[in-house]
Amino acid sequence: MAFSLAREENNIIKVVFNDAVDFQQRVAAVDQVCQLVQEGEVVKLLVDLSHFENLMTLEEQEKFGIYLASQDELENAKVASVTAHACSENVIVEAVAFTNGYQVVNFHSLKDAQAWLLGEFN
């Protein structure tokens, strides 16, 4: 499987992409995250893209960004993305999602991303 997903003890929902990932796999990950969200929960979501290869076309990235931003369960989510590169392969998705109201903060360190989600720094 191209991704793993779990709710950690600190209540962070963590998605790790391990491989080459296409549009359908990204949508499946979002759908699974939304199923974990409890009504009224302020979601803390950690998306680890440090070992992922993007197989989506530009059109699919734009479509996924819109899909991501349209999920009611993620409307007020606090989202951290971890990438291994200075230039994220996820930049189109994030830009389109941001334009549609979804916000994410990028990190190069898993530890920093977790600390931010837990409110240890702004």
Language-model features and meaning:
Residues A2-N122:
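Amphipathic, Lys/Arg-enriched alpha-helical "gate/interface" segment within cytosolic domains
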